[in-house]
Amino acid sequence: MSRSKTRQGKLPALGWNTWNAFGCDIDATKIMTAANEVVNLGLKDLGYEYINIDDCWSVKSGRDASTQRIIPDPDKFPDGISGVADQIHDLGLKIGIYSSAGLTTCAGYPASLGYEDIDAQTFAEWGIDYLKYDNCGVPSNWTDTYTYCVPDPGSKATNGTCPDNKNPAPAGYDWRTSLTAERYRRMRDALVSVDRTILYSLCEWGQANVNDWGNETGNSWRTTGDITPSWPRIAAIANENSFLMNHVDFWGYPDPDMLEVGNGNLTLAENRAHFALWAAMKSPLIIGTALDSISQDHLAILSNKILLKFHQDPVIGRPAQPYKWGYNPDWTFDPAHPAEYWSGASSVLGGTLVLMLNSEDTTQRRTAVWKEVPELKDVLGRQGKRRIGFRVTDVWTGKDLGCVRDHYSVELESHDVAALVVGRAC
């Protein structure tokens, strides 16, 4: 995407989206309620800024016969999308919209394939700041010649491979030449041509080897199929995304899908682990729960200032990375047990972010050994044989844990995560 108009898109997006909370049951009132809650709950002050309308916002029967524009549903949006955009902008927030790189959206509404220029211009005139662009409704003449391996559970994924893929591309095939890549480039070109900066979020489910071309096409790109508010799905997506961290840096972010914090029957520990992993991976953090009924515990997770500072670091674009798998041998692809030990440098925290995950179904002890953490090895090496420690802060409580030598151990309940800032030597 063009980076010349503004600095927008340098850092991973923060916001809220209708889909995980409401599906198709949306209207202007629900969206403005969410926007006002982003302000009232203090989320705007923490950097959350996008209020995104997902699928089902338009008239389903078709486009305007004379202009060929998509028509906002007048029952859901009496003042149109532009009316909602004006109200959201008045709050100091930004607004997002949804379409698909096909003939219809995933819910069967008019989509943008073949209408990219018209829709980009329409979105710009309405004051849109963000486009989520899905992958539904693709006609046969736009179907790729080959099938790319996205090792989601449901396929017979073996250590990240897809032995059930009957139509793989030949060795050396350039997926930039695929029809999927072309469909997404067409909307990119249309967005760049309008006189408004619109963040471009590709939602192609990891297909067509998007990690090779996503960053030259959009600001973020989905790496998997859809998330659900269940720990097995969250763990599986975290596992898949953990192998893509070398693609993360300023201006380009693999997207493991929107947040489910506050949804379903996730335990508080699972909500914590979900958010901490997504923040540490510098994924877009798009809230997907009803904010007018959110619990204080869930709000506290979404509002964690230390994780958000790491996520929005203006100097270091690289994410945290796994440095030890823990439950499994290193580099094991396991949907039930993603990498458990992560670390990442920060210019704003005064130290290194370290995560320890308990991926097991029972309470377990996890131990971060300082000499194993890549960011700490240089400091330890300079000290020679002298035994030193580091100042450690608990990310969840903000508590100073003092000068911790050699390692830090903690008992973690099932699917919980310990998050630490390991600071200066002591």
Swiss-Prot record:
Keyword Membrane part of the UniProt annotation: no
Catalytic residues identified in the record: 134, 226
Gene Ontology cellular component annotations, sorted alphabetically: extracellular region
Protein keywords: Disulfide bond, Glycoprotein, Glycosidase, Hydrolase, Secreted, Signal
Disulfide bonds: 24-56, 106-136
Endpoints of the signal sequence: 1-13
Transferase found in the keyword field: no
List of glycosylated residues: 141, 159, 215, 265
EC number, as in UniProt: 3.2.1.22
GO MF term list: alpha-galactosidase activity
Binding site for substrate: 204-208
Biological process per Gene Ontology, one example term: carbohydrate metabolic process
Subcellular localization(s) per the UniProt record: Secreted
PANTHER family: ALPHA-GALACTOSIDASE B-RELATED, ALPHA-GALACTOSIDASE/ALPHA-N-ACETYLGALACTOSAMINIDASE
Entry's family note: Belongs to the glycosyl hydrolase 27 family.
Protein name per UniProt: Probable alpha-galactosidase B
Organism: Aspergillus fumigatus (strain CBS 144.89 / FGSC A1163 / CEA10) (Neosartorya fumigata)
Taxon lineage: Eukaryota, Fungi, Dikarya, Ascomycota, Pezizomycotina
